[in-house]
Amino acid sequence: MSEFMKSLCKIAIPVTLQSMLQASFSIVDQVMIGQLGETNISAVGLCGNFSLIFSVVIGAVSTVAGILIAQFIGADDSKEAWTGLDVSFICGLIISAVFLLASGLFPAQILGLYTKDVNIIKAGAVYFRIIAFSYVPIAVSTILSAWLRCKEYAMIPFLASFGAVAVNTGLNYLLIFGKFGFPCMGIKGAAIATLISQLFNLAFIMVGFIVCIRKDGDKMMLSLHFEKITLRDYLVMITPILVSEFLWSLGQNVESAVYGHLGTSNLAAYTLTCPIQGLIVGALSGLSAAAGVMVGKRLGRKEYDGAYTESKNIMYAGLIGAVTVSALLILLSGIYTGLYRVDYSVKELGKILLIVFALYAPVKVENMILGGGIIRSGGNTKIIMIIDIVGTWCIGIPLCLLAAYVFEWGIVGVYTLLTTEEIFRLIVSLVIFRKRKWMISLS
């Protein structure tokens, strides 16, 4: 096996498995809560929409941490790599504290932005107040995972996720349905299970992080001062990612609000497809993570031709994988929607939405690899910010509103039209990739 394939598999496979586990984490929640009816499914889905904003913002911090750590490890500069981790860690704690306060104190007001259904808001507020406390452990574990992946210890976050899913599944069964003497808590039980599983995930990653540091003979450094770059450079790098990811997630929330106003059945149909969409994207997300680390290390060593060649090979692998998985999803979509105890019409809408998603999946995956891994690895994050803003707010959102309120289409038509913005992203990203101006060494 070539060195390229060894490095790719060492990073991509654990990250892929971890992403799939995290997506299955959502599927377990959805299927179990789905037994409680459409109101609870919708409530959890809307809470997830707000949590998505947190996830992408903290993911932006983790992305910058990964860019810096990968490049400086490639350049054999341990001190700068630790500084990248420490600064990102502080940013993550501040952001998670803000989201904790917002979702813990104002759950009903936040949910009211998505739906006017009082029952959904009431159920969602109970769920929201509990999962708000999971934001801090999620932030810490996400940033520590960036370090572990760059050091090619991606198996540790995967094992942590595996354990967390097992904990979540077991506690869901006990607390949602009141088995083995536990109280029957419904949606509240699902929230408690989620919180405990995230605490388990954090504990596992922290132990693994300490073990790996000792194994490598590294010394933990607390440093908030860069030497190769300035703090201003860090802010210039992270700000476009924060802006683009926040606006993208806000756009997702606007789209969800539109879905919510299409009616409870349409919202339920879309919500039940979200976990499987996350599972499919997660199945190929390892390639994006591997691209960021592998290409970043090449750039850190100023091996520009090697970085370009590796980027193309990863993109080819992503295309083949996406087409294969999409074909399987089209064949199995009906089986998945059949797992839910909802009306037949909701199942059929969900099945059609999954087929539409499968047709767009290869484009989505290539965008994920290019925008989320390759182009960002050079540190010039402004390019992706512009693509994201134009794609979401100048194309996706207007098409969504046009389809829903002018054409008055249903959920399938609205979703199909707005997803065409992925094609714009891919065309522009490919043009930028071929020009090679994104290939910058920070060392």
Predicted regions and their residues:
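N-terminal transmembrane alpha-helices
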Residues: 3-31, 35-36, 52-68, 93-100, ...
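Helix-terminus/linker motif at the lipid-water interface of multi-pass membrane proteins
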Residues: 20, 24-42, 111-118, 174-185, ...
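Short runs within selected transmembrane alpha-helices of multi-pass transporters and secretion channels
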Residues: 62, 131-150, 157-168, 190-206, ...
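Transmembrane helical elements of multi-pass membrane transporters/channels
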Residues: 10-29, 130, 164, 197-201, ...
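Short alpha-helical transmembrane segments in multi-pass integral membrane proteins
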Residues: 1-15, 69-136, 182-239, 295-360, ...
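Transmembrane alpha-helix boundary and packing residues in multipass membrane permease domains
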Residues: 15, 19, 30-31, 48, ...
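Small-residue-rich hydrophobic transmembrane alpha-helices
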Residues: 41-101, 138-157, 267-333, 365-389
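Residue-level hotspots within pore-lining transmembrane alpha-helices
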Residues: 17, 21, 25, 54-58, ...
